[in-house]
Amino acid sequence: MDHIRNFSIIAHIDHGKSTLADRIIQLCGGLSDREMESQVLDSMDLERERGITIKAQTAALTYRARDGKVYNLNLIDTPGHVDFSYEVSRSLSACEGALLVVDASQGVEAQTVANCYTAIELGVEVVPVLNKIDLPAANPENAIAEIEDVIGIDAMDAVRCSAKTGLGVEDVLESLIAKVPPPKGDPDAPLQALIIDSWFDNYVGVVMLVRIVNGTLRPKERIKLMATDAQYAVEHVGVFTPKSRNLESLSAGQVGFIISGIKELTAAKVGDTVTHATKPAPEPLPGFKEVKPQVFAGLYPVEANQYDALRESLEKLKLNDASLQYEPEVSQALGFGFRCGFLGLLHMEIVQERLEREFDMDLITTAPTVVYEVVQSDGTTIMVENPAKMPEPARIAEIREPIVTVNLYMPQDYVGSVITLCEQKRGTQINMQYHGRQVQLTYEIPMAEIVLDFFDRLKSVSRGYASMDYEFKEYRTSDVVKVDMLINGDKVDALSIIVHRSQSQYRGREVAAKMREIIPRQMYDVAIQAAIGAHIIARENIKALRKNVLAKCYGGDITRKKKLLEKQKEGKKRMKQVGSVEIPQEAFLAILRVEDK
């Protein structure tokens, strides 16, 4: 066991994490040069294209060190994005060490810091690495100062390398072996294995990626998952050297996979403990929690006959993404669709993009909403994730909305504009620190404000230099109201929005004005109203199209003209009673685009 090293790589987007992983795999001969491709561990096209890692992957490598010993290195590739922070914490708890990769030309960024703190809390040894030192803009001294300043770990002897050219990659592995402790654990103790990730394979069912903490696991043994108490027979165990390779057994300290014919991904929860069914471990490994969706949105097929196809697509996606939740929902305006829950905004974008790409769906998405805690007047508390399900104002005692703590990092030139943005979004400043040229701002902001367009606005006010990460803090009582949109007196459920009272007038007026531009003129007058409960706060009219019925009366008597106009009026009135206004799909997207000016 002294020759095993389990490590992962922490880095901000585009700091070269996947490239470094590629080089390490190549150096250790995990794949022949023919099979080598860039970003080996990012298996989804979407991961490659966006340059992000979504699912955790592993590679078991053998490396002959300079001291002549052969070491087994287990590389656990972690997602770097804040939406997947729970997965990151599971991946990190399976490791003893982490390479902190920092781009020498850019310095420290928000997500690096967030994941690095997670690593330090879990007691993982962090080894700093400066990447991209072949760039003319590289400034290693500055980057080292930032690592020491912002994260507070000693970085004087940080390894300098360039993953692109392969320069210094061996030094990275050497310092990894020197600094990271070997895994602790007893191969003879009762089995305890941590599920780092799981995914669905069409041939063998669910594949679980595990780190064996104690004990030994062999094929044909019966295992039990401690969170659900379900039992299965193990069919295969093995490791990935990115390609899968079956082994006789997996023992303490190793990272590998278990295949045991599980059909449902929801059975193999990330962070759960696997143990023997016959002599189970006395207690599960700490840190397991159920992942709860934070952001909800409605997904509807553009064509009504695509509903079944959408359901199948969601089921298939759910096989590989246990944190996605969905339930059927009917909207008067959009027909049949699903209400889906996501971990965060990036997760939502990815799910939408995969549905459109891999399953050729055409989708309409409603405005993303967050979950509100509503205390009703009879004292019961309900969770409302859909504005249409919000009770009547008279039955509500108080509404609590989710508050998140946001950490923002930016160069000091942009502090003013970022603070202005946070104030607009009802944020309260908690902290502000200067680290050299970088500034760290900490804010508490209602999640609903972040969901809409905070990230895009942040990037635009800081010219792309600011980075952020957020985590849920608590539910807090707030004065939020539900604004309904009425068209000719009928509520349109899909257009309801929940906003803070201070912004309700403005948002109501904006949406109404936007709808007026979008809805085509009808043969009769259309009234668009925004209402809070029974109180109308905004109104726009769309004038009717009318034929000039007086065209054929030259001169003539006024009573004749009056008669014709009255007759036209009667007709319009009748039309209005039976006519229904078609709402074009752009109207639903318009709500999303009502920015806070």
From Swiss-Prot:
InterPro entries: EF-4, EFG_III/V, EFG_V-like, EFTu-like_2, G_TR_CS, LepA_C_sf, LepA_CTD, LepA_IV
Record flagged with keyword Transferase: no
Subcellular location: Cell inner membrane
Binding site for GTP: D14, H15, G16, K17, S18, T19, N131, K132, I133, D134
Membrane topology: Peripheral membrane protein
EC number: 3.6.5.n1
Gene Ontology MF, one: GTPase activity
Name of the featured protein: Elongation factor 4
Species, as recorded: Burkholderia mallei (strain ATCC 23344)
